[in-house]
Swiss-Prot record:
This is Putative beta-neurotoxin. Expressed by the venom gland. Residues 28-39 have a biased composition (Basic and acidic residues). Keywords: Disulfide bond, Ion channel impairing toxin, Neurotoxin, Secreted, Toxin, Voltage-gated sodium channel impairing toxin. InterPro entries: LCN-type_CS_alpha_beta_dom (IPR044062). The keyword Secreted applies. Belongs to the long (4 C-C) scorpion toxin superfamily. Sodium channel inhibitor family. Beta subfamily. One of its GO terms (cellular component) is extracellular region. It comes from Tityus pachyurus (Colombian scorpion).
Length: 39
């Protein structure tokens, strides 16, 4: 992880929170922040 991610229910399926999980797309698609969690 290390990138800020979108919520799990978003179109790209990334994990929520400041540190995205082991999603294969985390470095290319988990950009921006998770507004709901204030990141």
């Amino acid at each position: 992880g290390g990138k800020e991610g979108y919520p799990l229910n978003s179109s790209n399926g990334c994990k929520s929170g400041r540190f995205a999980g082991t999603n294969s797309n985390e470095n290319t698609e988990c950009k921006g922040x998770d507004a709901e969690n204030g990141y």
